[in-house]
Amino acid sequence: MSKRAKKRDKSTVEILQVYSASRDEEQMTDLKKTDYLPYLFNLVMPKQFYKSPNRIVMARLYPDVQKHDEQAAEYFEGFQTPCFDLPTKLFPEKTPIDKIVFMPKVMLPMGFEAGGVFGPGVLPRRCYPVDLISPDHKGPMPPLFVGLRGMKVSLSSMINTFLNMYDSPDGKEPHLYEMHATNHHYENDLAPEELMLRPDFTLSVAYTLPASMCLPSPYPYPSVPEQDNIYTPDLSKVLMLMPHQFNITVAILSTVNNPHDPSVAFATMGDDEECPKFELPNDVFPICEGVNRPIFLPKRFMPKGFDACCVFKPGSLSELWYIKRIGRFGTPQEQYNCSITPPLFVGKYTRNAASINMLEEISVHFDQKARECAKSLARLRLDALRLNSRNGSTKGFLVMESDKPTTPAGAYSVESYEEASEDGCVAKVTQECATESTDTRDDGINTADYQSQFPELEPDSEPEPEPEPQTEDEGEDEGDKKCLSCFKVDSDIDLISHAIAEMGVAELSMLGEVDPVPGVDTKLALDQLHEVFETRDEIRSNIDDLMRDHVCRMERDIMLALRQPIRKCSACAKHS
C-alpha cells in the first residue's frame, strides 16, 4: 500500500505504455453502432513510445478535444476493422473489456496497426489506469484509447522534426534555411552526371529575377501568416536554367522567392483562362489526389519556353521521393517552413522553340535594373526620408465638415482642408442646406429635398420678413464655426456612417482638384463608396453566408477523404 500511495503523489501522465503483444494480420472484427468514435489520426505519441519494444499504448482522451465523429460512425458501421486480443494482465478482473470499440485504420493514430476506445464512463474507476487519472477526479471516467503500435513505424519528416524539437529544450525552428533533404548523404545516390542526364526528366534550377526597387507603402499592412493548404506562385519572371533541353523538367521552388499569389489561384479556378495540362509519367511521380494534387498554371503565369507546367504544393511529395529522384544534388532554396518538403515545379518544355541564352538575359536584366536604380536613387532617398518623418500610423481618408464643435467618435480634428489633404484625405463630406431640391437618399448622403417637410403658408398669412443681410464680420464668424474632422482608412465604417447620418443632408465629393487621382474614375469610386455605406449590413450578411458555406464544404471534403479506399502500391503491395 505504501508503494501505491507513493505513486499517487506523482504528477499524472496522459500516455502510458504497459505491455508487449502481437497480432495476426487477418484478425478483424465488425464495427457496431457506437456513441463514441473519435478521429485520432492527429494524435501523436511522445518519441520514446515509438522506439520502445513495448507495443501496447494506453492514452487518456478528452471528449471536448477528441470529439465523437457522428458521420464517421454512421459510415463505418458494419465495416471490418483491425483488432487484437487484450492481455489478461492489462486490466483487473471483471473489467468490461468487451465494450471496447475497435476503430477503422484511417482513424487510428500514426504508427498503429490496431486500436480501440472505451467511451466516456464505460470503465469503472477501479479499472481505469492509475497513472492516467488524478486522485481528485470526480464524475464519470474519461474515454481511454488502447492501441497496438506497429512493428516498424515510419513517421513523416514533419512529425520527426516536431518530436525532435520538443525533445530538446533549446530546439527552435529557424525561420529560413535550406531543404533538409539536401544536407545529408544517403546511400545508393545517383551520380551527378546520371542525375542531370537521366532519361525521364531534366533537373533544372529556378532563378527568380530580382524585383524593381519601389517605395515603401505609407500604409503598413500586417504580415500574412504562412499557410500550405494551397500554393500557386507567379512564375512569369522565373528563368529555368537547364543543362540540356528535354521534354519534361523539374525544379525545386522557394516559398520565399516564389510566394503564393492569390491572383494565380483565382485564375486557375475560373473558366476564363486556359490552364494547359499534360500527363505526368506514372513511373516518376506518385498519384496525388485531393489537396495534394498538382495545380496547372495559366499561360501568363508560366516561365518562358514552356507549353504547360504544374506545381506541387509544399508537403505534397514525400521526402523519400526527393531522396530517390533528386537526392543531394537539388539546388537548396529558402523555405519558410523547413519541417515539410519544398514545392516542386514540373514543366513541359516547348520542343520547337529556339533555346534562350538565360545567362545573357540575366545580364541584360541586371544592366537595365542598375540604370533604373541609378536614376531613381536620389528620388528614392528623398521620398524615404519624407516617409520616415511622418507618423508611422495610418492617416486620413475622408474629411467631414459640420457645424458641431465636437469631433465625432473615431475621428480626429484638423484645422484646414490643406492639412487634411496632407494627411492623405481624398474625399470630403459637406452639409447641405435644407432648401436645396435634389434627389433624396435613405442614409442622408448627397443632397435631398427638405422643402416638403415645412408646412405650406396659408393664403391669408403674411409672408415672413426677409432676414437682414449679414455683415462681413458676421459671415467670418459663421465660417469659423465649421469643424473639420478626418477619418482614417482603417476607421470603423459604422462610426463614419453614423457621423454622416447625424449631419442630416450631406454631399459626398472629392477633395481638392477635379481629377485628384489620375487614371481613376472618381465618379464611379464615389458611387461605390456610397453603396458601401448604404448596404454594409447586407455585405456582411453575404460574407457570413459565404464563410458558412465554405466551412460546410471543407467538413464534407474531410469526410469524403476519410472514406476513400486505401490504395496499394503495384510494385510492393504495401499501403500507399
UniProtKB/Swiss-Prot annotation:
The keyword Glycoprotein does not apply. It comes from the Eukaryota. InterPro entries: DM7. Keywords: Repeat. Residues 457-478 have a biased composition (Acidic residues). Residues 454-481 are annotated as: Disordered. SMART domains: DM7. The keyword Repeat applies. Belongs to the DM7 family. This is DM7 family protein GD16138. It comes from Drosophila simulans (Fruit fly).
